[in-house]
Regions:
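N-terminal amphipathic, basic helical "cap/leader" segment at the start of enzyme domains
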Residues: 1-73, 78-79
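Small-aliphatic-rich amphipathic alpha-helix that forms the alpha element of a beta-alpha
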Residues: 33, 75, 84, 90-131
Length: 131
């Protein structure tokens, strides 16, 4: 499938099949994130892969939604603000832009692998920090 077909096919998925994700499919998604362009190739993203039932339950708790994660894996895209490219004219660290690019690449790769995906930004970071 070409890029336009892939972009048209990608959509937000909120209910997932009750079957495991093939390791090679997960690796392909992670590799897409690694290949994504970032400011001066600093690669400030840190990707946490959550697959255990306990970890997925904690993610649901952080979203204040016990039904939030029927997925078999959740990828948390984080940024290291000490390892990002900083614009010289205003001192702004572009880690959020970089993380967004990485996430977009990974969402498209998930679609290419036949996996459903959902970009979620509604979560309580304090709950995640404690856990």
């Amino acid at each position: 499938m070409n890029f336009t077909e892939l972009a048209k096919k990608r959509c937000s998925v909120r209910a997932y099949a009750d079957k495991p994700i093939a390791p090679e499919h997960l690796q392909a998604v992670l590799e897409a994130g690694r290949l994504a362009p970032t400011g001066k190739n600093h690669q400030p993203q840190r990707i946490l892969v959550v697959q255990s039932p306990e970890g997925l339950a904690k993610m649901a708790q952080a979203m204040h939604n016990t039904n939030a994660y029927t997925a078999k894996a959740v990828l948390m895209i984080c940024s290291d603000t000490t390892d990002c490219w900083v614009r010289s004219f205003d001192g702004h660290c572009i880690h959020e832009i970089d993380a967004s690019i990485v996430t977009t690449y990974m969402l498209l790769a998930a679609t290419e692998q036949g996996l459903g995906s959902l970009w979620v930004e509604r979560f309580d970071t304090e709950i995640l920090r404690k856990e």
